[in-house]
Amino acid sequence: MKKQAFGIGIQLVGIIGIGSLLSGCDFRMSVKDRTGETQEYTAESAAAPNTLPLEVVKYQQLNTYQIGKALYDMSEEQVDDYLQDQGKDPSFYLGVGTNGEGFYSINSELGDYYTTVLSTFSDDRTLDSYFSAVDIGDTSIDAIGAQIEQCLKDAGFLIAFCEKYALCAEGLNQLQKDLYDEEEFKLYAPGAEVDENGMQTGELNSWGEADEAYLFYYYMAYHNTYVASVSGRNRIQIVYSPSKHQVVYGNGNLCPILTQEVVSSKEITSLDENEAIALAKKALSEAGIKDARFVSAKPVYVNNFGDISFEDQTMTLVPAWRVEYTVEKNGKTIRNWLHLNAETGEVYDNTIKL
């Protein structure tokens, strides 16, 4: 069989995320009534409108052969041979899952370690607190990220932007110590000693240079506009090991291949940039976050699980504002954001607890 891209010896599993939706105020009121203030706050740039229409768009179903060709340069015969060698059901592996929504997942023998690490991050503990986008050894994080992004584009995915982190040993070990001090919880690092039940034993295991990896988050786009999901599962997550020269973990949820076929399109009356920032400021204040510094407000699309029709293979894209802000935490500047419905001001909360 032809060698796979990036030396990937992987299995692909279809996954889908369930969306959640929280709202923060009565959307029948005016902006002034809801915020309790006039629009005195001025954005860093002039107040701009959100001109995105509400659209219902067809998305494309990918099959296992398309994925195999686009990502791994495999013929249909090679895909069949691979699946037979692995003993896997083609409706679950190397493809898009049983419903054909365009979702997939990657895993390898190291995947569980990084899954455990990434599962520890939440509102109180952020990736920014431990990791940054630095090169590991002589391997460029930018070059690797660009190669993976090109593979995703070849498969038909539209990428809005990418976030990059280097999961370095120093940060991994600091996270390990913090978790153990707070919760007596040990991260599953490669090489850890375990008992007959699979539980770690002995001292805190140490992460070394061979365990270091790059983490990439690729966010979806439609016509070069970011598509956010209120469930937070609007991105493809990839972990790449420089020492092994291969992808070792990744998954994609709510990441369809959007087509150019528009089923319906509707213009809306949108809040402007300053109105969106004022509502975000109010929501954060009510959540106890009063020291936020607002960085930007950008027009985006929002989609949730209820806006996907698997029968018709359509997705409803709702115009929204993405308001980015920063807060100071433990001496570091942490970036976060809120999404608001561009027409009603409804707050979609997929990043913090309001």
Q: Whereabouts are the PLM-identified features?
A:
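Sec-dependent N-terminal signal peptides of Gram-positive bacterial secreted proteins and lipoproteins
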Residues: 2-29
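Short, solvent-exposed coil/turn segments at beta-strand boundaries
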Residues: 98-101, 109-112, 210, 239-247, ...
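Segments that shape or occlude catalytic/ligand-binding pockets
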Residues: 147, 151-237, 242-329
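Preferential activation on post-signal-peptide N-terminal prodomains/segments
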Residues: 25-229
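Acidic, serine/threonine-rich low-complexity disordered tracts
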Residues: 329-354
